[in-house]
């Protein structure tokens, strides 16, 4: 956590050491890791502000959420995480990344969210029929703190190719068609809402 002033100078910070775990063939963090990490970072920040300036922060002019780009968090209609968070370190999406790269004529890295979703569909994973939306770690934290499905354009660029402040429309249609042929009928704009609501 970093606190800056109105001239963008850092005036305090807080941190927590954490490391992802390799479980069941997947690099992951648990929701408890995520929630506890945020709380610990903020507590450390607040205590550092108190130590340096003699006060605890009570309000802020603005806040921003930044986390590791890419990865895959799939949720059902009740906001339940369907499979453990798959971080950017995972290299289980080679087939999907290759097929999407060929389909779009645009390099899709294995770590991108769309590659993870596409691979889950290819693998006919049990959770796929229950997906209501997907998100990244930063998008998830933003949703938890603000109840809004939004990601910045930088974060969005690790989900699906972007153009301007949205996802590249000419790539959406062939991707949706290919997914539909494999039984996944959601539109990309619906998974998550942040596909079309970028900050």
Regions from the language model: what does each represent?
Residues 101:
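Phosphate- and other anionic-substrate recognition elements at nucleic-acid/protein interfaces
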Residues 90:
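Carbohydrate-associated surface elements
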Residues 1-83, 98, 130, 181-190:
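N-terminal glycine/serine-rich phosphate-binding loop of ATP-dependent small-molecule kinases
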Residues 86:
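Acidic, His- and aromatic-enriched active-site or binding-groove loops in soluble protein domains
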Residues 104-198:
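Gly/Ser/Thr-rich active-site cleft segment
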Residues 93:
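Gly/Ser-rich phosphate-binding catalytic loop and adjacent alpha/beta segment
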């Amino acid at each position: 956590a970093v606190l800056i002033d109105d001239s963008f100078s850092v005036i305090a910070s807080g941190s927590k050491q954490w490391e992802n775990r390799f479980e069941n063939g997947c690099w992951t963090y648990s929701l408890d890791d995520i929630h506890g990490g945020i709380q610990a970072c903020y507590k450390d920040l607040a205590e550092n502000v108190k130590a340096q300036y003699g006060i605890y922060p009570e309000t802020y002019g603005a806040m921003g959420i930044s986390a590791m780009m890419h990865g895959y968090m799939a949720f059902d209609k009740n906001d339940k995480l369907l499979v453990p968070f798959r971080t950017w370190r995972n290299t289980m999406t080679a087939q999907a990344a290759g097929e999407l790269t060929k389909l779009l004529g645009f390099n899709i890295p294995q770590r991108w969210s769309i590659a993870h979703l596409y691979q889950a569909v290819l693998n006919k994973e049990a959770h796929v029929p229950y997906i209501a939306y997907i998100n990244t770690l930063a998008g998830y934290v933003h949703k938890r703190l603000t109840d809004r499905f939004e990601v910045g354009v930088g974060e969005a660029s690790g989900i699906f190719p972007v153009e301007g402040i949205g996802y590249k429309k000419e790539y959406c249609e062939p991707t949706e068609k290919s997914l539909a042929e494999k039984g996944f009928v959601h539109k990309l704009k619906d998974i998550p809402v942040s596909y079309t609501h970028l900050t």
